[in-house]
Design a protein with these regions (language model features):
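Catalytic helix-loop patch of NAD(P)-dependent Rossmann-fold dehydrogenases
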Residues: 114-154, 179
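Mid/C-terminal beta-alpha module of Rossmann-like enzyme folds, strongest
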Residues: 197-200, 204-268, 280
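NAD(P)-cofactor binding segment of oxidoreductase domains
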Residues: 59-102
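N-terminal Rossmann-fold NAD(P) dinucleotide-binding loop
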Residues: 12-13
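Conserved Rossmann-fold NAD(P)-dependent oxidoreductase catalytic core, especially the SDR/UDP-sugar
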Residues: 86-129
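Glycine/proline-rich active-site loop of Rossmann-fold NAD(P)-dependent oxidoreductases
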Residues: 135, 148, 160-173, 200-212
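C-terminal amphipathic/interface module of NAD(P)-dependent oxidoreductases
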Residues: 272-312
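A conserved pocket-lining segment of Rossmann-fold NAD(P)-dependent short-chain dehydrogenase/reductase
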Residues: 170-191
Length: 312
Protein backbone atom coordinates (compact mmCIF):
# COMPACT_ATOMS: atom_id res chain seq x y z
CA UNK A 1 0.00 0.00 0.00
CA UNK A 2 1.19 3.51 -0.77
CA UNK A 3 0.20 6.15 1.78
CA UNK A 4 0.29 9.90 1.17
CA UNK A 5 0.87 12.00 4.27
CA UNK A 6 -0.45 15.45 3.30
CA UNK A 7 1.13 17.44 6.10
CA UNK A 8 4.13 15.77 7.68
CA UNK A 9 5.10 17.59 10.86
CA UNK A 10 5.75 15.86 14.17
CA UNK A 11 2.53 13.82 14.20
CA UNK A 12 2.52 13.10 10.46
CA UNK A 13 6.15 12.02 10.53
CA UNK A 14 5.56 9.66 13.44
CA UNK A 15 2.55 8.15 11.64
CA UNK A 16 4.56 7.90 8.42
CA UNK A 17 7.36 6.03 10.18
CA UNK A 18 4.82 3.60 11.57
CA UNK A 19 3.29 3.02 8.14
CA UNK A 20 6.78 2.40 6.76
CA UNK A 21 7.63 0.00 9.59
CA UNK A 22 4.51 -1.98 8.64
CA UNK A 23 5.86 -2.37 5.11
CA UNK A 24 4.00 0.41 3.31
CA UNK A 25 5.47 2.98 0.94
CA UNK A 26 5.05 6.48 2.38
CA UNK A 27 5.09 9.82 0.56
CA UNK A 28 5.29 12.91 2.78
CA UNK A 29 4.22 16.39 1.67
CA UNK A 30 5.62 19.35 3.56
CA UNK A 31 7.36 22.67 2.94
CA UNK A 32 10.74 21.34 4.04
CA UNK A 33 10.90 17.68 2.95
CA UNK A 34 14.65 17.54 3.56
CA UNK A 35 13.83 17.23 7.27
CA UNK A 36 11.98 13.94 6.78
CA UNK A 37 13.63 10.65 7.78
CA UNK A 38 14.80 8.32 5.01
CA UNK A 39 11.84 5.96 5.43
CA UNK A 40 9.50 8.68 4.10
CA UNK A 41 9.78 9.90 0.51
CA UNK A 42 9.55 13.67 0.75
CA UNK A 43 8.08 16.16 -1.71
CA UNK A 44 7.89 19.93 -1.38
CA UNK A 45 4.31 21.10 -0.88
CA UNK A 46 2.48 24.10 0.54
CA UNK A 47 -1.02 22.76 1.07
CA UNK A 48 -2.67 26.17 1.36
CA UNK A 49 -1.20 27.42 -1.93
CA UNK A 50 -2.70 24.77 -4.18
CA UNK A 51 0.65 24.10 -5.87
CA UNK A 52 0.99 20.42 -5.03
CA UNK A 53 3.21 17.67 -6.44
CA UNK A 54 1.79 14.67 -8.29
CA UNK A 55 0.14 11.99 -6.19
CA UNK A 56 1.79 8.57 -6.60
CA UNK A 57 -0.30 6.56 -9.05
CA UNK A 58 -0.69 3.62 -6.65
CA UNK A 59 -1.80 5.64 -3.60
CA UNK A 60 -4.61 3.90 -1.72
CA UNK A 61 -4.70 5.90 1.54
CA UNK A 62 -4.31 9.60 2.26
CA UNK A 63 -3.80 11.22 5.67
CA UNK A 64 -4.36 14.97 5.98
CA UNK A 65 -2.55 16.22 9.10
CA UNK A 66 -2.60 20.00 8.92
CA UNK A 67 -1.38 22.62 11.38
CA UNK A 68 -2.08 26.35 11.21
CA UNK A 69 0.95 28.63 10.94
CA UNK A 70 -0.35 30.87 13.74
CA UNK A 71 -3.32 31.00 16.16
CA UNK A 72 -5.33 33.41 14.00
CA UNK A 73 -8.59 32.97 12.14
CA UNK A 74 -6.94 33.64 8.78
CA UNK A 75 -4.23 31.06 9.43
CA UNK A 76 -6.75 28.44 10.48
CA UNK A 77 -8.85 29.01 7.37
CA UNK A 78 -5.81 28.89 5.09
CA UNK A 79 -4.67 25.61 6.63
CA UNK A 80 -7.81 23.67 7.38
CA UNK A 81 -10.28 24.81 4.72
CA UNK A 82 -8.06 25.95 1.85
CA UNK A 83 -5.42 23.31 2.52
CA UNK A 84 -7.89 20.45 2.74
CA UNK A 85 -9.74 21.67 -0.35
CA UNK A 86 -6.50 21.71 -2.32
CA UNK A 87 -5.59 18.20 -1.21
CA UNK A 88 -9.06 16.96 -2.19
CA UNK A 89 -8.70 18.60 -5.60
CA UNK A 90 -5.39 16.79 -6.08
CA UNK A 91 -6.73 13.43 -4.90
CA UNK A 92 -9.92 13.55 -6.95
CA UNK A 93 -8.05 14.67 -10.05
CA UNK A 94 -5.25 12.14 -9.78
CA UNK A 95 -6.94 8.94 -10.84
CA UNK A 96 -5.11 7.15 -8.01
CA UNK A 97 -7.05 4.23 -6.44
CA UNK A 98 -7.52 5.99 -3.10
CA UNK A 99 -9.95 4.09 -0.90
CA UNK A 100 -9.60 5.83 2.46
CA UNK A 101 -8.85 9.45 3.42
CA UNK A 102 -8.29 10.32 7.07
CA UNK A 103 -8.53 13.92 8.24
CA UNK A 104 -6.88 14.78 11.55
CA UNK A 105 -9.40 17.02 13.31
CA UNK A 106 -9.83 18.25 16.88
CA UNK A 107 -12.19 17.89 19.82
CA UNK A 108 -12.33 21.71 19.64
CA UNK A 109 -15.37 21.22 17.39
CA UNK A 110 -17.39 20.41 20.53
CA UNK A 111 -16.62 23.57 22.46
CA UNK A 112 -17.50 23.56 26.16
CA UNK A 113 -19.85 20.87 27.50
CA UNK A 114 -19.88 21.94 31.15
CA UNK A 115 -17.91 18.86 32.17
CA UNK A 116 -20.39 16.40 30.64
CA UNK A 117 -19.41 13.29 28.71
CA UNK A 118 -19.42 13.50 24.93
CA UNK A 119 -18.85 11.03 22.12
CA UNK A 120 -19.15 10.80 18.35
CA UNK A 121 -22.94 11.15 18.56
CA UNK A 122 -22.70 14.51 20.32
CA UNK A 123 -23.61 17.47 18.10
CA UNK A 124 -20.57 19.71 17.55
CA UNK A 125 -21.03 23.20 19.01
CA UNK A 126 -17.67 24.95 18.67
CA UNK A 127 -17.19 27.96 20.89
CA UNK A 128 -14.32 29.67 19.08
CA UNK A 129 -13.15 30.28 15.54
CA UNK A 130 -10.70 27.37 15.59
CA UNK A 131 -13.44 24.84 16.28
CA UNK A 132 -15.81 26.46 13.79
CA UNK A 133 -13.24 26.42 11.00
CA UNK A 134 -12.16 22.84 11.69
CA UNK A 135 -15.82 21.80 11.72
CA UNK A 136 -16.26 23.55 8.37
CA UNK A 137 -13.36 21.48 7.05
CA UNK A 138 -14.99 18.28 8.28
CA UNK A 139 -18.18 19.14 6.43
CA UNK A 140 -16.16 19.97 3.31
CA UNK A 141 -14.52 16.56 3.47
CA UNK A 142 -17.84 14.73 3.73
CA UNK A 143 -19.42 16.75 0.95
CA UNK A 144 -16.53 16.45 -1.51
CA UNK A 145 -16.04 12.69 -1.07
CA UNK A 146 -19.71 11.73 -1.19
CA UNK A 147 -20.26 9.29 -4.04
CA UNK A 148 -16.56 9.06 -4.98
CA UNK A 149 -15.88 5.61 -3.55
CA UNK A 150 -13.37 7.10 -1.10
CA UNK A 151 -14.21 6.52 2.57
CA UNK A 152 -13.71 9.68 4.66
CA UNK A 153 -12.57 9.23 8.25
CA UNK A 154 -12.39 12.08 10.76
CA UNK A 155 -10.14 11.59 13.80
CA UNK A 156 -10.89 14.26 16.41
CA UNK A 157 -7.83 14.46 18.63
CA UNK A 158 -7.68 15.91 22.10
CA UNK A 159 -4.66 17.91 23.24
CA UNK A 160 -1.53 16.26 21.87
CA UNK A 161 1.39 15.89 24.24
CA UNK A 162 4.60 13.92 23.95
CA UNK A 163 8.32 14.34 23.32
CA UNK A 164 9.17 18.03 23.09
CA UNK A 165 5.64 19.10 24.03
CA UNK A 166 6.35 20.06 27.61
CA UNK A 167 4.27 23.18 28.29
CA UNK A 168 2.68 21.90 31.50
CA UNK A 169 5.95 20.40 32.72
CA UNK A 170 7.70 23.71 32.09
CA UNK A 171 4.97 25.62 33.94
CA UNK A 172 5.26 23.35 36.98
CA UNK A 173 9.06 23.55 36.94
CA UNK A 174 9.02 27.30 36.46
CA UNK A 175 6.49 27.96 39.20
CA UNK A 176 3.88 29.56 36.92
CA UNK A 177 1.34 26.72 37.10
CA UNK A 178 -1.87 27.51 38.97
CA UNK A 179 -4.53 24.95 39.89
CA UNK A 180 -7.89 26.29 38.64
CA UNK A 181 -10.49 27.08 41.28
CA UNK A 182 -13.28 25.53 39.22
CA UNK A 183 -13.37 21.87 38.26
CA UNK A 184 -12.33 21.71 34.61
CA UNK A 185 -11.72 18.55 32.63
CA UNK A 186 -9.05 18.23 29.97
CA UNK A 187 -8.67 15.56 27.30
CA UNK A 188 -5.35 14.57 25.79
CA UNK A 189 -3.57 11.93 23.77
CA UNK A 190 0.10 11.09 23.54
CA UNK A 191 1.67 11.80 20.15
CA UNK A 192 2.61 8.15 19.71
CA UNK A 193 -0.93 6.93 20.40
CA UNK A 194 -2.33 9.53 18.00
CA UNK A 195 0.03 8.30 15.28
CA UNK A 196 -0.81 4.67 16.03
CA UNK A 197 -4.53 5.46 15.80
CA UNK A 198 -4.01 7.03 12.36
CA UNK A 199 -2.26 3.90 11.10
CA UNK A 200 -4.86 1.63 12.70
CA UNK A 201 -7.85 3.41 11.16
CA UNK A 202 -6.21 3.50 7.72
CA UNK A 203 -5.26 -0.17 7.66
CA UNK A 204 -7.94 -2.07 9.59
CA UNK A 205 -9.86 -4.58 7.48
CA UNK A 206 -13.40 -3.37 8.12
CA UNK A 207 -14.84 -0.06 6.97
CA UNK A 208 -14.29 2.61 9.65
CA UNK A 209 -17.00 4.82 11.09
CA UNK A 210 -17.15 8.42 9.82
CA UNK A 211 -15.81 9.92 13.07
CA UNK A 212 -13.64 8.79 15.98
CA UNK A 213 -12.54 10.62 19.11
CA UNK A 214 -8.80 10.29 19.65
CA UNK A 215 -8.31 10.76 23.38
CA UNK A 216 -6.87 8.55 26.10
CA UNK A 217 -8.92 6.57 28.61
CA UNK A 218 -9.08 9.18 31.34
CA UNK A 219 -10.32 12.75 31.07
CA UNK A 220 -8.55 14.53 33.91
CA UNK A 221 -9.07 17.72 35.86
CA UNK A 222 -6.26 20.16 35.20
CA UNK A 223 -5.49 20.34 38.91
CA UNK A 224 -5.00 16.58 39.07
CA UNK A 225 -2.51 16.70 36.20
CA UNK A 226 -0.56 19.58 37.74
CA UNK A 227 -0.40 17.88 41.14
CA UNK A 228 0.82 14.67 39.51
CA UNK A 229 3.58 16.47 37.62
CA UNK A 230 4.71 18.30 40.74
CA UNK A 231 4.89 15.01 42.62
CA UNK A 232 6.84 13.29 39.82
CA UNK A 233 9.26 16.22 39.67
CA UNK A 234 9.67 16.33 43.44
CA UNK A 235 8.43 19.92 43.58
CA UNK A 236 6.03 21.83 45.78
CA UNK A 237 2.42 21.58 44.66
CA UNK A 238 1.28 24.53 42.51
CA UNK A 239 -0.88 27.11 44.30
CA UNK A 240 -4.64 26.95 43.96
CA UNK A 241 -6.46 29.76 42.24
CA UNK A 242 -9.01 31.73 44.27
CA UNK A 243 -11.65 34.18 43.12
CA UNK A 244 -9.39 37.09 44.07
CA UNK A 245 -6.00 35.43 44.39
CA UNK A 246 -4.82 34.63 40.87
CA UNK A 247 -3.54 37.24 38.49
CA UNK A 248 -4.98 37.48 35.00
CA UNK A 249 -1.70 36.19 33.62
CA UNK A 250 -1.94 33.09 35.79
CA UNK A 251 -5.51 32.45 34.70
CA UNK A 252 -4.64 32.89 31.02
CA UNK A 253 -1.62 30.64 31.35
CA UNK A 254 -3.59 27.74 32.75
CA UNK A 255 -6.42 28.19 30.25
CA UNK A 256 -4.02 28.09 27.33
CA UNK A 257 -2.27 25.03 28.68
CA UNK A 258 -5.50 23.09 28.84
CA UNK A 259 -6.35 23.39 25.16
CA UNK A 260 -5.04 21.47 22.19
CA UNK A 261 -1.28 21.90 22.11
CA UNK A 262 -0.24 24.87 20.02
CA UNK A 263 -3.62 26.21 18.96
CA UNK A 264 -6.26 28.78 19.80
CA UNK A 265 -6.33 30.20 23.29
CA UNK A 266 -6.27 33.62 24.86
CA UNK A 267 -3.69 35.10 22.48
CA UNK A 268 -6.42 35.32 19.85
CA UNK A 269 -9.20 36.48 22.14
CA UNK A 270 -11.18 33.26 21.72
CA UNK A 271 -11.98 30.73 24.47
CA UNK A 272 -9.53 27.92 25.18
CA UNK A 273 -9.90 25.22 22.56
CA UNK A 274 -10.01 22.55 25.24
CA UNK A 275 -13.32 23.59 26.78
CA UNK A 276 -14.66 21.67 29.77
CA UNK A 277 -15.79 18.23 28.67
CA UNK A 278 -15.06 14.55 29.09
CA UNK A 279 -14.46 12.80 25.78
CA UNK A 280 -15.12 9.07 25.43
CA UNK A 281 -12.80 6.89 23.35
CA UNK A 282 -15.09 3.84 23.51
CA UNK A 283 -15.70 3.76 19.75
CA UNK A 284 -11.98 3.83 18.93
CA UNK A 285 -11.26 1.09 21.47
CA UNK A 286 -14.13 -1.00 20.04
CA UNK A 287 -12.10 -1.35 16.82
CA UNK A 288 -9.39 -3.22 18.72
CA UNK A 289 -7.11 -0.23 19.17
CA UNK A 290 -4.95 -0.37 22.29
CA UNK A 291 -3.24 2.60 23.92
CA UNK A 292 0.42 2.56 24.87
CA UNK A 293 -0.31 5.48 27.20
CA UNK A 294 -3.86 4.96 28.52
CA UNK A 295 -3.70 8.00 30.79
CA UNK A 296 -1.62 11.13 31.34
CA UNK A 297 0.34 9.34 34.07
CA UNK A 298 2.01 6.79 31.80
CA UNK A 299 2.53 9.40 29.09
CA UNK A 300 4.12 12.07 31.25
CA UNK A 301 6.31 9.52 33.03
CA UNK A 302 7.67 8.49 29.63
CA UNK A 303 8.34 12.13 28.70
CA UNK A 304 10.11 12.77 32.00
CA UNK A 305 12.20 9.63 31.38
CA UNK A 306 13.28 10.99 27.99
CA UNK A 307 11.42 8.41 25.89
CA UNK A 308 11.04 9.40 22.23
CA UNK A 309 11.97 12.47 20.18
CA UNK A 310 9.99 15.26 18.58
CA UNK A 311 10.34 15.21 14.81
CA UNK A 312 11.45 18.49 13.17
Amino acid sequence: MTVLMAGCGDLGTEAGLRFAAAGHRVMGWRRSPEKLPAAIEGATADLSSGELPPIPADTTAVVVAIAADSPTEAAYRAAYVDGLSNVLDAVLGSGAPVRRLLFVSSTAVYGDAGGDWIDERTTPEPGGFSGRIIREAEELLSRRLRGTGITPVVLRLGGIYGPGRTRLIDQVRGGSAVIPAESRFTNRIHRDDAAAAIVHLCTMDFVPAPVYLGVDNEPAEMGEVLRFLASELGLTLPPSETAEGATQGEVSGTAQAGGTQGGGGPKTGEPSRGGNKRCSNALLRSTGFEFTYPSFREGYRAILAGVGVRHP
